[in-house]
Each structure stands twice: as structure tokens, then as C-alpha cells.
């Protein structure tokens, strides 16, 4: 069957992007397009629920916003999940965010999902699923302790 992690992103404790992992493999990531009309500070929580069947360690995450590296901090690590957090400041009307465990260009073109989040109209859309099955949960009702961003 192959290895498959679970990968979710929680944005400001209000929006959850679920199942961003690939159908198979040790990679996870996505491309986000965020539209906003004024300055916004977004707190992103990345939740990885690893499949330990074939690995000893979880790959780290890399985040770029409009081609600038974003600092990502590992905040929790258990047998059941690994949590990273990052803060992104939106200054432009349109912000492109790349989140990945492996930066191979082919993964962004054909495998990682592409999601559009319009913060003005509150319309959130999956533009391309590619080799994953993502969905958007809004408003978020945290059902796991680590999903709450208090």
C-alpha cells in the first residue's frame, strides 16, 4: 500500500485545510493563494499525523510567502502528531504561499493541491486537487486539543 501521512493546516483557529497529503508517499504540501484588502497577520498551524510504518523521522516543513522564507517552529511532537507553527504577515492584495516537505518542482505542478482563500469575501476554494483529496472546513470546530489555537 505504501506510506501515507495525514497533513492539515489550521489558519487563525478558524479555517482548516484538511487532507493535504499525497495519496501515497512521504511528501506533503500545498500552494495557497490568499487575497486580502488590507494588512493581516495569519497564524498557521501545520499538523502532521505520521505513518510510522516505514519511517523513523518526519520530514520538516519549508514555507515561502511571495518568495520570502517564513520561519517555521516545531511546537509539539508526540507519537501521534507533529505540530509546526508559522506567522505570515499579508501586506499585498494577493499572497502566494508555498508549503512543502520536498521542493521538487514537479510536486507543485502535478501533485500538491492548490487552494484559493479570499479573506475579503470569505470564499475558500480548492482550485486543483492534483494527487490528493483536500477539503476546507470553515468555521472550524476543533475536535482535537491541538487544533485549538488559544
Swiss-Prot record:
Q: What induces it?
A: Expressed in the early phase of the viral replicative cycle.
| BP term (GO), one | viral process
**InterPro entries documented for this protein:** Poxvirus_C7/F8A
Q: Which UniProt keywords apply?
A: Early protein
Q: Does the keyword Secreted apply?
A: no
- One Pfam assignment: Pox_C7_F8A
Into which family does the record put it?
Belongs to the orthopoxvirus OPG027 family.
UniProt function note: Plays a role for multiplication of the virus in different cell types.
Record's protein name: Interferon antagonist OPG027
Please name the source species.
Answer: Monkeypox virus (strain Zaire-96-I-16)
Q: State which gene encodes it.
A: OPG027
